[in-house]
């Protein structure tokens, strides 16, 4: 009786048949169609990482692990003798001194790290103020101005808080005569910050990471006095106070003080030679309103820690920060602390360093 082939024999026969067919196929490899399957990429639907928290106050460079998220607050402050001593100048992070009509000066005082209760006397805005304040994307408080000047503030991305428009925070101080009697409460000004102003300002200058490492301190020459003549009628002096570790301000030769009698001082004094031109606009007395040309370039000096160094300044646009460059072509590092900036008109103003 013949036996039926088993499964193993059947499988061997099938394999042999397949090999035989392959041998008859012309000897070339058999093309096997392929299909590309695109990879599936899962989108990261999580929130973007939060920016790193600041480790220093942006307008002073002073280290801190608790930098407030409030915006920068700039306030126009008067500097006539009737306005002195002004409230709040001693608490400002940065103060700009500018020449206005008649050769008098006014301040743009900028607050962020400190919150003085009261500031003033407050006065009106001027054509150069947008270029000073715009890089901080903050608030500018002032009493009023001609319409084109106010429009320029808004066009620069700055929020205006204006007494003449009924905004909160302004009051008239008893015992002072107009127009030297308008003061303001910083808490009320900050409370009106709009939804675009919920972050601290960007740094306006570069600061040394530790004390004594500023550019003037490490590479400058000793300085005892900066004598700044802004006009025929306005003169500021800054003398180095070794005991105080700061430059001390005088109006002319008279010490400048706060309402409490404390001397006004600065860790850094920046003196810049700037172009000043007359606008087509006039003040109520008929004098042309001047404008300091903030966009451009020029020379100057930076003084820190009893030393001074020559610098070049440049500013590319209204909303661009002012850049200070040292003799080596590198960016100037300021010492940590308050900075005062003197805008000295070329030709009509001057300064000496001794």
Residue ranges, per PLM feature:
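Post-signal peptide N-terminal segment of mature Sec-exported envelope proteins
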Residues: 33-52
